[in-house]
Structure formats: structure tokens, C-alpha cells
Amino acid sequence: MQPSDRMRALPRRARVMIMVTVALIALLVIGPRLVVGYTDWLWFGEVGYRRVWGTVLVTRLILFTAVTLLVGAVIFAAVVWAYRSRPLFAASGANTAKDPVERYREVVSRRPRSFTVGIALLLALPFGLHAQASWETVQLFLHGGAFGTVDAEFGYDIGFYVFDLPFYRLILAWLFIAVFLALLIGLGTHYLFGGIRLAPSKDHVIEVSRPARVQLAVFAGTFIALKAASYWLDRYSLLWSGRKEPTFTGAGYTDINAVLPARLIMVAIAVLCAVAFFAAIAVRDLRIPAMATALLVLSAILVGGIYPALIEQFSVRPNAADRESPYIERNIAATRQAYGIGPDRVDYLDYPGVGTRSPRDIPADVTTIANARLLDPTVLSRTFTQQQQLKNFYGFPEHLNIDRYTIDGQLTDYIVAARELSPNSLSGNQTQWINRHTVYTHGNGFIAAPANRVNAAVRDVAGQSASSDSGYPIYAVSDIASQVGGDQVIPVEQPRIYFGEVIAQADPDYAIVGGPEGVPPREYDTDTAQYTYTGTGGVPVGSWVNRLAFAARYGERNILFSGAIGSESKIIFNRDPAARVEHVAPWLTTDSNPYPAVVGGRIVWIVDGYTTAAHYPYSQVGSLAEPVVNDTGRTLAREEVSYVRNSVKATVDAYDGTVTLYQVDENDPVLGAWMKVFPGTVQPPTAIPTELRAHFRYPEDLFRLQRDLLAKYHVDDPREFFTTNAFWSVPSDPTADTGGEQPPYYVLVGDAGTAAPSFRLTSAMVGFNREFLSAYLSAHSDPENYGRIDILRLPTDTQTQGPRQTQNSMISDTRVASERTLLERSNRIYYANLLTLPIADGGILYVEPVFTERLTSTPNSSTFPQLARVLVSYREPGTGGVRIGYAPTLAEALDQVFGTGTGAVATAPGGDATTPPPTGGQPPAPPPPGAPPAPPPATSDQLTAAVLELNNALANLREAQHTGDFTTYGAALDRLQQAIDTYLAAGGTPH
């Protein structure tokens, strides 16, 4: 019986069932992608970046189609070639009774076209899907330009390595895949149709027909030719070789003098091998390509592996410093350029580490001390929550932020936070879908607290009578209530927050808002009022098509049937500020710490964006991200880069979600390429509002990376670099229970030239595997000097204590140790940010706030940290000893270290959010045992006059600080001292 007789046609009903099943499977696979694609299209339209979505989609589709067609066409050609050149006996079906593949041959022969196309598509589709993810590489190749800098080995512009070479490697990889699959499929097809047979004779184990030999030789020769091209491109990849890591990245002596020549030799051998395969077509002798292949493999082992290893072992290692010095010099220059830590951005200044003058005599030091930050944003989240939460469904992030504001002409740094909606804190009936997504939709207000003072000093911190209303932030609240009352310190026109970090922690994070006029508001605003969203943000869900799409996206039928959704309703989603920026600018890497700011009366999130590249020749490899440990305890791999620029500052409006990208680096070639890919998406620097620019901070992730690199790359001499003797280390965090590196700190310090307050990101550095202080880094955030990094270098034989030594000295002090013993009985102690402050014309002042929190066994108790003490450490000039100050206030601690008078320039506790109190505004400290009796109090008129003169003297001193005139400043300081003496003589309270 013929095969066609054995095969019966399927009934029509069965065919329909098969088609329906296939359609349902396709719908299940493709349907969710279509839903997400459609809702994303709506979202990109809402934020005004639909062109980005379209460009990415079109690029992906073109890549998918091109690679699928390329791989599929080559495979198709291989199958057709093998099928059409099959032996006649296979075509006629003769003498196949004992052929083991006869059954399969018959099946394929019935529908050769279907099988050919099917196999080609089946194998090509996965590679097409994989290729579409490389859209960034293709777009950078099409739009990339020159860096204006050439590499030290080949003399090519850096743009070749960043923009062009990755694309060439991508093309080569696709060709490799296509040819290799074609070779395998051609081999299989020839075997199926008899072009290749297991021979029964003793002379030949395998019989290969001439057409099969020709086809296999062509594809094998092509594959080897591609390998030759790969060897050629591998020469350029040596410029980021990891052979010498961790010493340095890039081609070393062995790479340049052994591996590079070996690559050229391998190119020549591979070309000869490819020619040998092509020659086998005419010569009809497979021994030639076989010997060529053996030569290629043997050469790869000897020339590519053993020879470089011998050079490394017997020539380089015995003379490593001499051999590697020229290449280390290349690495130093390239790394500095790639990470923006070269002499064009970094200023070095030798610094003795020992003070030579009194801080009171230096205007910049007076500014630094007056603005010494006592509030720690990593400690105060629960304090903010307990004192400013208002409702259980509001919340603050675990780590607050630091920014600065000019209030009444005075620049002050503030601990800032947005009072966001916390959906995960909803409880009971609040978690019902209708409440969670249509009633509790937004946060309320911007909270700020001056970072250099608290409301009052805590005196008897260890006693049971410790004040419950002391040691807490002084809040400046800009919310709905303060807006109505008209008493906002930082004016906010729209205090409602629909987009934020805490809001986005919910999954899903969407809210359905808005409604037609005349319909009663539904959203919770205050206890006495509801609200209807009127912003431009959100995707309309009034139509049934959109409601169905979002119901499918979130798997929520209530979106379809809820009566709370009307014709004017909108759905707000993608509410995380950093995620919104990453969506509209997928080519950016965002900083891990967005922060809120009030700009133009609106609350906006400021997000730092980085452009990166992975293959900058000779540049050291680094990572912007902190190490991440998963649930199993394994450290996850981090994205490695070798070029970084903080070229974009983005803002996200907290009310309507508007995303705006601003260019802040006009010399970044990577950003220039992306601006060509997505024209009009990034605003020029001239479009940045002055008020917004005043809130730009030097980004923390970039500073951490640069700090790690500067620990090594401050060294100029390659031989000294090789020995590592002059390296620095990032100090361990002495205040953290789990160890780790000390984080950088934002501080407001006095500018050495003008004495005006300057907002900077700072970090101490210690010697390599030592604990003594070696350097002090500070990055400017002020608009006029933004991005410059100052480095104070201490002598290599310095005995100035580093952060951990200082911490140990302070907590070992007898006063501290004795009180700590009492405190730990009923309190938890938090040692907050240990600030390193250069003062006294060469000295280092350490300031560390100490917070306490009452221990309690009561469930859900409302205890939270309060500032209890201030620790101060300073190296004494001359003797080199360390002076420790420990007191309820910074002023008292400074007076213990520097003597009476220095504390007068510190900011006292109390006052309101805009105005600190006069220097005498602190409660009196209890007299020490055995002290002489206090003098009789002065008259009220004398004390009033003394306070008035003291305030006038302080005002005069602040004015003198801003003039930069040292003579005027000295006179103002003398007047202040006289006023202090008069005030004390009149019975005023000392610090």
C-alpha cells in the first residue's frame, strides 16, 4: 500500500478544532504582549514621549525581521541546495528498502517546501527575538560620532570602540549563527537524502557525494573566514583585556607583544584554512582542509595560548614594574578621562592635617561650624513618620534626603521628604479595591527640617524624666492645611503627591482618578474634604476599549464594572519617578536616590541620569550600583561600565507626572548620539530654570564610583601605581552595625575664598590598609562650580585619625563611656553620620550626633530617635593629642575642645524653621559638683540690653561673612566676643 493510501484526511470538525486550539494558544502567548503594548502606547502618549516608544518598537521590529530573514534565508538556501543536489537513487526511491531514514525521507518528500520553510523559520525565529534586544547597539552605530580622543595603541577615535565595534561584532555573531546552522542543517539534509551515507565497504566508512562535499566545503570555508574576521576584531578587544586585573584594565605587555601578534598570525592561518576548504571543491581531496583545520587548532593552542603564557611567566613577571609601566600609564590617562576625574575636573591641594589657627578667626570655618549638620537622614525616617505622618496611610521613605533652600536670604541645608501615600499601610476596609484605588490616591505635602539644629537640647537623657519634646527636628510643613493657613516657609502651590517612591512600592500601584464636573469628589484629601484630580497626568479610561485593556493588564474585573469609573476618569500608573524616567529614556541609567524639591511652587522629583559605555579602551571597569545580595545570600552580578557621565538631570512632577529631561553636559558624545536617535526629548541647558539648577546635587552613585577610582587613580607615576603604596581606601563605616564602606555625606561648608556657604558631597579617605586619614574629597553642587572635585591630600606620614579611629576614641572617652552605660539600660543608641570637616587652616574636625530611642516592651509603641548628644573630635596642634567634646549641644562640645568662645558661632537649638535663636537661647546646664555659687542675677534692663547687643553682633557677623573682607570679619568677631562677655556678665546663660 502506498503511503498516500495509508494517510486518511482529517475530518472537517477535527481540522476546525485544531485551528481553534492553535488560535487560542497563540492568543494566550501573544495576547498579554498586545495588551501591554497597547496600554504602554497610551501611557507614552500621555507623557508626551510616544516618539520614543515608536522609535524603539520600529527598531526592534526591523532587527527581528532582518535577523530572522538572514538566518532563515541562509538555512533555507542550505536545505534547498542539499535537496536539489540529492542523489538520483534518493530522488527515485530505489534501493532504499534497508535505508534506516527511508521513512523520514518519504515524509519530507511529500511536502518539501513546507518542511524547508518550516525548518528555516523554526530555527531563525529565536535568534530574531534575541536580536531585537540589541536595538541600542544598532542605533548608536547609526548615530554615534567622534569623541575627539584616540586610543594609545591603534590610534582610532574612541567613538570607533564605543559606537562601531559593538555593531561589527553583532553582525559577525549573526553571520556565525546563520552559517553554523546552515552547515549543520545541510549536513543533516544530505544524510537524509543520501548525499552522505554510512558506507558498507571496508575502504570507506562514510561516502560523501560530490554535491555534498561542495556544499559542506563552502559553508565550512565561510565559517572559517568569519573566524578570521573575528580574530581581526579581537585585536581591538585587547584594549579592555582583563589579564592584568585587579592591577589595571587594558592591554599589558603580554597582550601587546604576544597576544596581538598571535591574533595577526591566527588571521593569516584562518584565511589559509578557509582557502583550503574552498580549494577542496576543485581538488576533490578532503585531506587539504583537514590538515588546514588541524593547523588552525594547533596554532590556536601554541600561538594563541602557550606562547603568551611563556612571555608572561618568563619575561613579564620577573620585570613586571618595568614591563607594565607604559601600559599602566595608558590606563591612568584613560580612566581619568572616562570617569571625569582628570585634572580638568579635579583639583589637588596639600593639607597638613593639623590646625594652625583658631576656627573663630577664619570666616569660612565660622560658616562651616554654623551649618554643621546634626540631623541624619538615615536615622530620622521614623521620627518624621511619628511626628508628621498625620494618617496611617501616609508614609516616608526609609532614607530621607538632604537639600538646601535660601530662606530670608540665608542658605540652609534641610532634611527633606515628601509625605506620600503608602498603599501598603492601608488596613481593614481601606484595602477594599474601591478605597485602595479610587479613594486613597495621593499624598499630602512637603516636609523639611533645618539640618543644623533641633527644637531644644536634651539635658537629662539618661534619666526617666528625660524631656519628651526635646531633640527633635523643627519642621517646615508645606501641605494642604498650611496652604490654607498661608503660613508655608517653603511655598507650595500644589501639595498633593500622586507620584513618588513610597507610592510605587505597592503592586500594582495604579489609581483611578478624575471625573466630570458636578459629580461629588471621591478622593480623600482631608478629614473634612474630598478631591477630584484635575492634572494632565493619567490615561483616559472612559472608553470600554481602554477599560478592557487595563482590566486585562492588571487582571482586575472591577475596572470593567465599577461605577466609580466614568467618562472623564483616568488611570495613573508607573508612579515611581526613576521608573518613569527610565521608560521615556531607556538609554539612561538612573541614580538610586531621587529626591524631592520645591521648584516654582511645585513639588518635583529630581532624578540623575547617566550615560554609560562598556568598552572604553584602557579604562578601568567599574559599577554604578551597590552590590546586591539576593535571598540566598549570593551577590548578584552588577552591570559593569568603563565610561560614565552624569549628562542628564530629569524632573518628574509629583502631581501630574510630567517628565522633563535636561542636558547638563554638552561635551558627552554618548548623549549626543542619543539626542540624534530621539530628537527633541532632551531639553538644552538654557532651558533649565535657575530655581531648579539651584537644587541640583552632585549624584551619590557617581561620587561613590569616582571615590573608589580616585583611591588608586590619584597616583601619577606608573611605578608607584604598580606598588600600590600610595593608594587610599574608603574607610569602613564606624556607625553601622553591619560594617561596609562609610557613605559620602552632603554638607554645607564655608567656601575658602568667599566664606559663603557651599553645598558639597564629601568623603574621607584613609591609607591603603591603614586607618589614618589620607585625603578628603568634596564635590561641588553649587551652580557656579558644579561638578568640580577638590581633594585635600594629607602627608603620607600623617597621624591624623581616620573615621574609625576617631569613633573608637570618642566612645572610649570616660564621659561618653559612663553615660553610655546608663543610656543602654533604657535606650537604644544611634551613632549618626560622622562628618569630617576641614577647619582651622589645616585641621580636621569630626562631628557626630548621637541619637537615642527609649526602649519599651509595649507593642506598637511610638518611640522614635531624638538627638541627645553631640560628639566632637579634633587633633590638638603641637602635641598631636586628640581632644574630645561631648555635650548636649554642638556649641558646648566645641567649647570643650577649643575653649570658650568658639561655640558662639555654632547654631543653637530652638527657633523656628527659618530663624535660629540667639546664641544664648539654650537652657542652662546644671553646675558641676563643687562649683562656686552663681553670681546674683542682673537687672532685667541690663540683660535685655545685652541680648539686644548680642543679636546685633550676630547679625553684623553674618553680614561680614558674606563680604569676604577679613578685616571687616575680624572686627565683627571682636564685637561678638565683647557682646558675649557683656551678656554673660549680665547673667545670661552660657552654652
Curated annotation (Swiss-Prot):
Protein's UniProt keywords contain Transmembrane: yes
Keyword Transmembrane: yes
Ranges where the record places region Disordered: 902-940
One Pfam match: UPF0182
Stretches with biased composition (Pro residues): 915-938
Residues of the signal peptide: none
Transmembrane region(s): 16-36, 61-81, 115-135, 170-190, 214-234, 263-283, 291-311
Protein name: UPF0182 protein RHA1_ro08670
Organism whose genome encodes this protein: Rhodococcus jostii (strain RHA1)
